[in-house]
Amino acid sequence: MSATGSTQRRLTVADILSMHADGERLPMLTAYDYPTARILDDAGIPMLLVGDSLGQVLLGYDSTVRVTMTEMLHHTAAVVRGSKRALVIGDMPFLSYASIDDALANAGRFLREAGATAVKIEGGVRSARTIEALVRAGVPVMGHIGWTPQSQHGMGGKVRVQGKSRETARALLADAIAIQEAGAFSMVVELVPEQLAATITSRLRIPTIGIGAGAGCSGQVQVITDVLGLGDFSPRHARKYADLQGAIRTAAEAWTADVRMGSFPGPAETVRMDEQTLDEVLGRTAQDRASGEATDADRAGMGLHAGIPLDRDL
């Protein structure tokens, strides 16, 4: 039975590598919260990446550079709680692996505190020693080459395809080999020409997960908000499979209209209490109720002095 057929336990790195060896294409989506993780897990997505992209698509930051370890751990833990089967990968944020000691400490927090199975690290040759140290310490690592958003300022600041020249293409090949030899179990290949990404994939034993890198990779990853149509901008490499932004707006407008018209809440959304109990609370008789006359308790403020709480939390 394929690893994808098991729903009784969480997938492992060994399962992902087995799927790759069997020729299965590997889908991966980003997830940032409990309900989304639960839905994606139920849909059979084998890998969920808690990407630092959450800084832009969830928290409103202008780049991923501002995302902190505290934020990443918070969201990774939510995704782990929401999923039962998917392998959850925590994205190491900017400067959290600036030194090997930092990398070991922070990657350990992803596994120990948040419950992730693996971490993702950007960079090729320059990150190889860090990846090797993490793998030796027992931390599964997913690499990331091509366009690496955390390095955007050092790469000119503008999002652009990487590896279009002879020199940069050769450098990416070297990056990929270095990551594999350092012990990573897979790598993201982002914004790389299709032919180069396919060549990199063919030269590796480990799976490549492409984003904006063509169909020749071992698998694909997308940012969940792009797939669901949440946001005003959709990158060229994304395909929108739903329009949740429109659906949410329509639902919010309909609910607002119902509130203003007084049709929400209706009987189906309302709880009533026993009239006899209400009579006792208000200090009235059934005859008072039938006649519609106000009692002394009504005039005194519905008997609020009798212990009806005014400060209850919503």
Predicted regions and their residues:
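Alpha/beta enzyme core
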Residues: 2-242, 246-275, 279-280, 284-314
